């Protein structure tokens, strides 16, 4: 463990540090439940998974965080998921006019699709791409173009996917594509991920993510900040606990132990930090122990664990030991009101089937809302700092 205090503010005053706001989609589950469409969504989702093999691990089936980008010359605006669990960038092809590319009408979101014919800087490659995510497939063809991140930050000749086929998970989310922030080894088709093309423009090869507290499930809005080239000293504590990465694919590292209530488990676990996953994913073997400690019950119809909403503030902390330091997650963060009946709330923890050298835990937005995550590319490490919130 390395505990570092950020007393070196001067280097972050240059123009090579860029802070850009993020926005939340709100809870997809809540929207589908409210519309009476969630069971239909689950059936379609299961059918799509039967004959696929996943590579990037992110799960976009609930709340996700987006950044505003532009692609092309002149620039065309798109809202992309900021995803540390995958490494590719893709946008939706304007020529794709089916229901999945156009998006679910109930999302109240008009898709911003990319029209390659209107970009003078677009160059099409003679290559197709196909990416199977944790829950959802997208495919199309590859090309290069200019990508704007905001604040004058631009990547020229970024290789990206132009998607003309999407699965249901992407169809129902109010988003226009993915901006992958993982390592090159995870990239499909051996493309260079955006962050690797961005590094030369930054003070230091670092980016940090701060997500604001969860908002009412039915609303989206401004909900965080991503800082390229430095650490968000306004929204994050000065004390940062760093741990080395165990693999430069995902942002993967070792966790020393986990505890909730009277249950504890110690010993190394492979964990990843994933801004593209809404919840925390835990090993199957531990899910029952977590459910026991929180008095959660399995909701067969909605395929989630639930607890009484009245216990949202009184449940035990989820305590993660990382780099010798304790990182408790309060129950107000991992118990979510998504509009279920009978005063029930969702336990924002899902099972993960681990194998080989991959992760056995995923720390998604539930964890990141409580702790700023600092992604240090240059030193192949990840850091965690207490997040500041106004309420």
UniProtKB/Swiss-Prot annotation:
One of its GO terms (biological process) is proteolysis. It is an enzyme of class 3 (hydrolase). Its EC number is 3.4.23.-. The keyword Lyase does not apply. Disulfide bonds join 309-345. Induction: Induced in response to thermal stress in conditions where severe cold temperatures are followed by warmer temperatures. In particular, induced in the warming phase (10 to 22 degrees Celsius) during the cold (4 degrees Celsius) to warm (22 degrees Celsius) temperature transition. Expressed in intestinal cells. One of its GO terms (cellular component) is lysosome. CDD domains: pepsin_like. Its main location: secreted. Glycans are attached at residues 68, 108. One of its GO terms (molecular function) is aspartic-type endopeptidase activity. Keywords: Aspartyl protease, Disulfide bond, Glycoprotein, Hydrolase, Protease, Secreted, Signal. Residues 65-385 form the Peptidase A1 domain. The keyword Aminoacyl-tRNA synthetase does not apply. Aspartic proteinase. This is Aspartic protease 17. The lineage of its organism: Eukaryota, Metazoa, Ecdysozoa, Nematoda, Chromadorea. The gene is asp-17.
């Amino acid at each position: 463990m390395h505990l570092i205090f950020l007393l070196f503010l001067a280097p972050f005053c240059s123009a090579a540090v860029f802070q850009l706001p993020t926005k939340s989609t709100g809870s997809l589950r809540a929207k589908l439940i409210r519309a009476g469409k969630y069971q239909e969504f689950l059936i379609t989702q299961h059918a799509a998974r039967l004959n696929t093999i996943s590579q990037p691990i992110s799960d976009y089936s609930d709340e996700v965080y987006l950044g505003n980008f532009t692609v092309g010359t002149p620039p065309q605006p798109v809202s992309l998921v900021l995803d540390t669990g995958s490494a590719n960038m893709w946008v939706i092809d304007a020529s794709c006019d089916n229901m999945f590319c156009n998006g679910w009408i109930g999302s109240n979101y008009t898709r911003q699709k990319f029209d390659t014919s209107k970009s003078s800087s677009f160059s099409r490659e003679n290559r197709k791409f196909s990416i199977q995510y944790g829950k959802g497939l997208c495919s199309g063809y590859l090309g290069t173009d200019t990508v704007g991140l905001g604040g004058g930050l631009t990547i020229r000749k970024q290789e990206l996917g132009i998607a003309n086929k999407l699965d249901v998970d992407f169809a129902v989310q109010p988003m226009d594509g993915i901006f992958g922030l993982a390592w090159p080894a995870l990239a499909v088709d051996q493309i260079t991920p955006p962050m690797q093309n961005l590094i030369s423009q930054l003070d230091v090869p670092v980016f940090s993510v701060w997500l604001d507290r969860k908002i009412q499930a039915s609303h989206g809005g401004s909900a965080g900040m991503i800082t390229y080239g430095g650490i968000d000293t306004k929204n994050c504590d000065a004390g940062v606990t760093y741990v080395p990465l165990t693999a430069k694919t995902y942002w993967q590292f070792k966790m020393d132990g986990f505890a909730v209530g009277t249950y504890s488990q110690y010993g190394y676990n492979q964990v990843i930090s994933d801004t593209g996953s809404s919840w925390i994913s835990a090993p199957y073997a531990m899910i029952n122990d977590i459910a026991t400690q929180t008095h959660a019950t399995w909701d067969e119809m909605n395929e989630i664990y639930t607890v009484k909403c009245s216990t949202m503030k009184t449940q035990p902390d989820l305590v993660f030991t990382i780099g010798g330091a304790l990182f408790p997650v309060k129950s107000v963060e991992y118990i979510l009101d998504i509009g279920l009946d009978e005063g029930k709330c969702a336990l924002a923890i899902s099972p993960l089937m681990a194998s080989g050298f991959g992760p056995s835990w995923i720390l998604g937005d539930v964890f990141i809302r409580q702790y700023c995550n600092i992604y240090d590319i240059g030193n192949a490490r990840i850091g965690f700092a207490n997040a500041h919130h106004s309420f």
